[in-house]
């Protein structure tokens, strides 16, 4: 038997299904804007202001589910034998290292999700792995350092919205690994938990983008967990750089002056520069 399924622009937009050559579904491709909620108004400064002032009653229900579901599947990933067991491999001999724990739990959740575990996950920008990456490191850091539950919820607003902000320019589906954006978001959320606000978070975002923006997306599979670990590490490094008085500057590769200009440049890189890359990745994956 053979099957062919095509999705366009976002994860649930099925436009073609064929089985053994028989077309079961075929419909016109919608435009990139159709069926998607516009978030072009987002900015890092606005996200931080929102996190500081939002009535948590308006966002708590979804964030509580994100905490419960995403940590539950992370625990399952550490208990079980899933894929390449990236999470448990990272943790070996480094159980007391908080940065290691953040990478471990995020990777373990992806280990499980990418390799048959049916536990639910609260997503970000249509992706379970992005929802995991944006939330689990922030939750682990808050628990390990004794932050209040309110502080955690507000930090999750930052991490989720920064991830969404980056994905707005990139698009939900692309040749650019979504974990990169979510790892940046995680770094921003942890910066918020440590007391950082716009300046700290903006520098964390720019620094992290400069580190991991070359990672490609080649489908959902076991190595996604390793890419998540690398992306979380980049977010943590971006924050550590700012805390130690170091940064990447405009002109360092694709980095531009200002966080919003850098974010916009990544979107342009992906939408224009990586269009052919996406096609070639699919071609390579389909080779016998």
What are the residue ranges of the model-derived segments?
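Glycine/charged-rich beta-loop-alpha catalytic/anionic-binding loops adjacent to active sites
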Residues: 113-123, 163-173, 216-221
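Alpha-helical support elements that line or immediately flank enzyme active sites
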Residues: 131-147, 187-195
């Amino acid at each position: 038997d053979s099957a062919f399924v095509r999705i366009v622009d976002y994860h649930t937009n099925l436009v073609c299904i064929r089985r053994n050559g028989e077309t079961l579904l075929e419909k016109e491709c919608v435009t990139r804007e159709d069926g998607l909620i516009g978030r072009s108004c987002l900015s890092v400064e606005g996200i931080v202001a929102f996190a500081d002032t939002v009535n948590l009653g308006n966002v708590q229900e979804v964030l509580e589910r994100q905490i419960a579901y995403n940590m539950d599947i992370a625990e399952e990933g550490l208990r079980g034998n899933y894929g390449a067991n990236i999470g448990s491999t990272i943790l070996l001999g480094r159980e007391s290292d908080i940065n290691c724990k953040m990478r471990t739990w995020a990777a373990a959740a992806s280990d499980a999700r990418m390799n048959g575990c049916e536990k639910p996950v609260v997503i970000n920008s249509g992706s379970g792995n992005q929802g995991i990456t944006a939330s689990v490191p922030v939750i682990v850091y808050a628990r390990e350092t004794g932050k209040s539950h309110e502080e955690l919820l507000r930090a999750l607003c930052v991490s989720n919205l920064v991830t969404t902000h980056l994905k707005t320019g990139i698009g939900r589906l692309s040749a650019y690994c979504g974990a990169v954006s979510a790892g940046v978001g995680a770094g921003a959320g942890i910066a918020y938990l440590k007391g950082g606000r716009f300046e700290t978070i903006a520098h964390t975002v720019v620094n992290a983008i400069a580190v991991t923006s070359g990672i490609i997306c080649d489908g959902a599979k076991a190595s996604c967990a390793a890419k998540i670990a690398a992306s979380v590490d980049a977010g943590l490094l971006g924050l550590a750089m700012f805390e130690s008085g170091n940064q990447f500057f405009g002109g360092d590769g694709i980095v531009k002056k200002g966080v919003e200009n850098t974010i916009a440049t990544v979107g342009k890189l992906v939408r224009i520069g990586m269009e052919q890359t996406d096609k070639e990745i699919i071609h390579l994956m389909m080779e016998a």
